[in-house]
């Protein structure tokens, strides 16, 4: 068939949209048995182009599809208000991405296979934190600015580990070592 039409599936889901040579083509909408709805652009029976999915739980994805999967730029707004926008490869965040949390703080950085990897920044009303990530944890150097205080730390698996340098708003300074987030070994405080 060619032109508009619909399909009722045995599992209770339904498709309505355009067909060309018997294949889904151009615009079409799925209504799934669980209440999830999806509107896609189709090419050769498969979602390719822009689309939007309204999940049963209230989450919404809007963005690009290729070969039936989220590929390219997209945004997910979760039912609790948490939001991710960025690049997807085969349904998984890969590339640059931005997360906006409920308190409106933001993470911006790079994702690899769905986890934070490489340079990233966390910004809120109170802090700015530039840090390296590995396997979704702080790893490597990081600089945290909180008001007039600056904290330069080295991290291993999310914990301060190694040389740290802290400069406080009263111009006092701490330099010393941390191990597993605890001060360890020698350190120096300098008071103004």
Regions found by a protein language model. Name each.
Residues 1-2, 7, 14-25, 37-48, ...:
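Conserved anchor residues at repeat-unit boundaries in beta-strand-based tandem repeats, strongest
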Residues 9, 30-32, 55, 78, ...:
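Position-specific recognition of the canonical hydrophobic site in helix A of tetratricopeptide repeat
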């Amino acid at each position: 068939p060619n032109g508009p039409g619909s399909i009722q599936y045995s599992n209770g889901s339904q498709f309505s949209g355009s067909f060309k040579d018997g294949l889904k083509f151009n615009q079409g909408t799925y209504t799934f048995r669980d209440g999830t709805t999806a509107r896609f652009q189709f090419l050769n029976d498969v979602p390719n182009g822009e689309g939007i999915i309204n999940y049963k739980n209230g989450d919404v994805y809007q963005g690009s599809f290729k070969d039936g999967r989220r590929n390219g730029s997209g945004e997910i707004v979760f039912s609790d208000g948490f939001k991710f926008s960025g690049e997807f490869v085969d349904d998984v965040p890969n590339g640059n991405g931005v997360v906006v949390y409920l308190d409106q703080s933001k993470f911006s950085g790079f994702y690899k296979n769905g986890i934070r990897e490489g340079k990233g920044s966390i910004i809120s009303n109170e802090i700015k934190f530039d840090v390296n990530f590995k396997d979704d944890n702080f790893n490597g150097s990081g600089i945290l600015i909180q008001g007039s205080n600056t904290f330069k730390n080295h991290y291993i698996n999310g914990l301060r580990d190694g040389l740290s340098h802290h400069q406080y708003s009263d111009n006092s300074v701490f330099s010393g070592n941390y191990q597993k987030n605890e001060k360890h070994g020698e350190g120096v405080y300098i008071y103004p």
